[in-house]
Amino acid sequence: MQNHRTSRRSALRRLAASLALLPLAMAVPAKAADNFPSKPIRLVVGYPPGGSNDIAARIIAPGLGQALGVSVVVENRAGASGVIGADHVAKSVPDGYTLLLSSISPIVLAPQTMKAPPFYAPRDFKAINMMALTPEAIAVGPRLTGVKTLKDLLERAKRQQITLSSSGTGGLPHLTIELLRKVRGNIVHVPYKGAGPAVTDTLGGHVDGIVMDLPPLYNQIKEKRLTAVAVTSEKRVDFLADVPTAQEALPGFNVENWVGLFAPSNTPNAVIAKLDQALRKAVSEPQVKALLANAAMAPAMMDSPQAFQKRHADDYARWGKVIKDAGVEMTD
């Protein structure tokens, strides 16, 4: 009996000692957040240099670094439609020093086209905030003379098969084409390995038209090499004000590609709040706004990190259904 009492007292003492240490253990993240940031931050992009994600990262990194008082270094980790870079961030130490700049494809679309995705994005990332929006552009090349609007394109599809190129399988341009196919089935998706070949073949008349993120098509449209029949944003974009929205022909047809910042899921909320504040300051800078506009991106932020987290989860569910219904699978 004495041994039992001694053992019980020892256990209680150990428990009391553990409870006494709890405030210290809990204070570590808070202290780290108080001192954040104290060293350079890596901003990972899941694509090679020169694409829309990379351009956005290099636009925002200097302003973000200035707001935080440390260097923000862009790091390209390309592959698997951005998933390789995203996975690297998801598995990084959640201390705010390794962040992901991502559009909708790497953490909404591409993982849902994989048989065994390496992460579940709504769970494995914590949103910081959105920084910009850009629509898809629906444009036609020289093969479709007389087609000036999306209504014209859909009418032409009643009489003949229409081929629309994109930068590859499973991206937002491809899924936009799948939504058009639901309206008019006589549309064929022609995937290419990248924006460059898709644009070249559309200009050369090998396909009828193209659906792509606006930035790679912007100059071709401005120089009238391609005819934009619609942008898929809710409202017309300022830098192509004469191009109608898809909703003007198809009410409710709204497809926007966002660009935003994310951290690993267990990053302290206090660190997320500091990053959100710094991002807001950077995006509000006139120079950043001008650079985004020149890249055919519209500065855009949500009310809070939590609001962007919900937008991410909602988009994941919405596009997951489109991917499943279309039977889209990543093949390379």
Q: Language model features by range: what are they?
A:
Residues 7-17:
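N-terminal export leaders
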Residues 105-116, 178-183, 209-242, 320:
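A ligand-binding cleft/hinge motif common to bilobed small-molecule-binding domains
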Residues 91-97, 112-197, 246, 251, ...:
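Hinge/capping helix and adjacent helix->loop/strand transition within the periplasmic-binding protein
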Residues 31-124, 161-163, 169, 182-211, ...:
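N-terminal (or domain-start) structured segment
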Residues 101-106, 166, 195, 212-217, ...:
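Beta->alpha turn/N-cap motifs
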Residues 38-40, 222, 269-332:
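An extracytoplasmic/periplasmic, membrane-proximal ligand-sensing/linker region
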Residues 16-25:
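Bacterial N-terminal signal peptides
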